[in-house]
Structure formats: structure tokens, C-alpha cells
């Protein structure tokens, strides 16, 4: 049973005479007037039909309607930890919905002194039948990256109402932070157009140059395979790690070059010719330092971004390579992607950081490694992962960690079509991706 009681003074339960009943009526009137003027907490409800509840009275946070903090001129629904590290509760309302309708949920919030907003602040949608019985899995709309200029975050996602559903219970939750406060505003669940499939065609190449005389010879070999991939109209092609070094007599330092530089120019001309994006592993020289770098080339042939490998094996350190210091995501015309390189896949933090930043596909130029790690990174972050390698498998992995298609020595180019708008539902869990960062261990437990 959920606790949905306010913080107002409550009258005695019974009286045995007329005067007592009269006094009770006066007391009730006084309390109601007091609550209306001083606080909206008394019944946990206000004019827009929002209520408040907590799993247990003992863990209920402070909750109130705040007219001093507004969203587009309207009062906000506030929740505060009030010194309780274990505080947990939510505003809620139930609304009628039509089966098969497409509805877009949106709620906005502004938070202060909240340690982990993704974990402590979220919305949940519970589907119900006509009697109010829960149907299927709850939904956890995504918190969009970034904030508005005035500091508001947005929770937003589009849903199709399941066929047997007639009601939706919407919850706006704050939990597990003693010192924080959140204000919710502008919450809506409105009819929308059905989403179009968001199709991306992803290519990976499996090729290891041997007895190559130069970096340029390597590039020519890879360019022939890119041309072969282009026949299948991919949106993006993934190439392997250190592609200008492998098979030559060069070392990390002698194979390094500026980025942008001659290789990005060479690859850019190809990308522009075939109207595709390209991910490629190179060795970058920047002043006195050399990095193991993956570049992203856009359809116009421009350098759209680069990632310097953060997790270096000792062998690369001994060879004079310097580690990078950040994980970045990049927006393309089909979605948001992240880049990792080889040894990064050994450590969960790399892929987890990219997923937390909104990456939908992670590209992995890799010399060689354990395929189980690639599968794990895809599963635990609910992303697609694309590897291009010499000594592991070059493949596209889905959100279950399954190989959708593999490139081999005999068939070095594969192209896979992915719908980034397709929801993956897991037995007993539902949409795991939407739950991951709501239920992830807190940083203070890890550190």
C-alpha cells in the first residue's frame, strides 16, 4: 500500500455530543482553509488533479506545489529530500488513453543539490486496463542530454499505446538524495504522429594488409573495399585500428601524422564521392605527442570529429603513445554515435560513458580482442556495436550481443540495416535501455 498523506494537522476521529460535532466541523473548516492558504500538501492534490504518494510513510519526502518556482508562468510540482537519504516518492495522475494511439510524453524539471539526476529524478508510465489493473511493462521516458538556457531538463519520449490498455498512470519521481530538490513543470502526454523508421545502413570491413610497402599502399587497399561497400549504399563504414601501420615496417611514431592531414584528406575524398560517413583508426601526431586516434569523416569529406584512445595497453605506452582523456559522442544525420578503440572494450566505463551521453551505435576499430567483451558492451548499454578488426571478428552486434552479420576473409565487406527507432523489449524487464541509468549503482557506491 502506498502512503499518500499530507503534512496537515488532523482532527480527532470522533465526538459523542452535538457540541463536539460542531467543534469538529469548525476545526475541519479551519484546517481546510489553513491548508489552502499555506500549503497544497494537505490532500496531496491540486487543481490539475495531481496526487502524491510514497511506498511508505516513513520514507516520504517533502512535497508541495510551488508558486515561486514556475514553468512558463505555471506553478510547479516540487519534491525535496528534507534530510532523508532514503526519501522516495512521486507525484502522479491517471488519464484515459486510446489503444493504438501514439502519444508523446514530456515533462520538464529543474533540480538543485541533486547528486545523480538520472538516478534520482525520472518519470514512469504505467499502462492499465479499464479497471486500473497494470498491463505489460512500465515505460521510463528518457531524460534528454543538455539543459535549456534557463537550466531546465526535459524528459521526453514517444509511445504507442498497447492494444489492451485504456489508462496511463504517470509518475514524476524524486528519490534517494537527502539534500536535493526538484521542480516538475509542463508535463503532458499528447497525441502525436506515428514515428517513421529511422533506418541506418552500417558497413564494416575485415582486411589485414600484409607485406605492405607504405601507409599509402594500405590506404589504396582499403579504398578498394570501401568502393565495394559503397555499392550497397551504406550510411557509414567502419575501418580498423592503426590502418596506416598494420602490415608495414613502420612503428607507432613513424606512422603518425597530423589530424587533419594527408590520410583524412584521402579518406575525405572517398567519403564525399560515395556520400557516406567513415570511421577509421590512425596514429596522430600533435606537437610532441602521438595518440592512437579514431576519426569520423562526414559525407562532405570533412573531419567531423576524432577520439584519442583513453585506455592504453602497456605495449603502446612503451612504444611512445600518450593516452587521451575524454570520451566524446558525435551527432550524424542518422543518430548519435560513439567511438572506442581496441583496449577500451576491456573496460565497462568506456562504453557506459558513451551510452550515458546518448550514443546509439558504438564503433570499435580494434586490432584484436575477446569477442565476448564486445557482446557484453552492447548488451549492458543497449547499443549497437560495430567492430572492424584484424584478429577478432569484424561484425555488427545487436542489443542482445548477437552477431547480425560478420565480415570475413572470404567476404570482407558486410552491410547491415538497423532501425534506430525500434524498441527492444526484454522478458520480465521491458525496455532495458530506458531503465539502465535509473537503476545504475550510484557513484558514491563505486568510489
Residue ranges and their predicted role:
Residues 259-278, 345-420:
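CN hydrolase (nitrilase-like) catalytic-core segments centered on the catalytic cysteine
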Residues 41-198:
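Extracellular and organelle-lumenal recognition/adhesion modules and their flexible linkers in secreted
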Residues 8-28:
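Bacterial N-terminal signal peptides that target proteins for export
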Residues 150-158, 329, 388-447:
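C-terminal beta-strand edge segments of enzyme domains
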Residues 197-212:
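Short beta-strand segments enriched in small/hydrophobic residues
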Residues 25-37:
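Bacterial N-terminal signal peptides
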Residues 216-220, 225-299, 352, 368-373, ...:
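Cys-nucleophile CN-hydrolase/nitrilase-fold catalytic domain and related Cys-dependent amidase chemistry
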Residues 285-357, 372, 376, 380, ...:
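Active-site catalytic loop in hydrolytic enzyme cores
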